């Protein structure tokens, strides 16, 4: 019984240590790599699902005002 508990404990410890090793070796994603959140990128900027230095897209509010201006002319 003791041997079985020790074996299971050692097995779980190895799994935990391997997970820690993978997490510490998993570095951030470089520019151009796919991302979902900013913390995944080295420069902490995820824009349109890609890591970038800064988001090169126009501000959404400015784009919305352009649409309102377009509809106002009709």
Curated annotation (Swiss-Prot):
GO CC term (a single one): extracellular region
Family (UniProt): Belongs to the conotoxin I2 superfamily.
Q: Which UniProt keywords apply?
A: Cleavage on pair of basic residues, Disulfide bond, Secreted, Signal, Toxin
Q: Does the keyword Glycosyltransferase apply?
A: no
Q: Which domain of life is it from?
A: Eukaryota
Q: Tell me the protein's name.
A: Conotoxin Vt11.7
Query: Sorted alphabetically, which InterPro entries does this protein's record hold?
Result: Conotoxin-I_CS, Conotoxin_I2
Q: In the record, which residues are listed under signal peptide? A: 1-26
Q: Does the keyword Hydrolase apply?
A: no
Single GO MF annotation: toxin activity
Q: Which residues lie in the propeptide?
A: 62-74
Residue pairs linked by disulfide bridges in the UniProt entry: 28-42, 35-47, 41-51, 46-55
Subcellular localization = Secreted
Q: What is known of its domains?
A: The cysteine framework is XI (C-C-CC-CC-C-C).
Reported tissue expression: Expressed by the venom duct.
């Amino acid at each position: 019984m003791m041997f079985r508990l020790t074996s299971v404990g050692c097995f779980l410890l190895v799994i935990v240590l391997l997970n820690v090793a993978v997490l510490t070796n998993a570095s951030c994603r470089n520019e151009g790599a796919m991302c979902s959140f900013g913390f995944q990128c080295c420069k902490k900027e995820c824009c349109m699902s890609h890591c970038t230095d800064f988001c090169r897209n126009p501000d959404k509010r400015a784009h919305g005002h352009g649409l309102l201006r377009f509809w106002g002319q009709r």
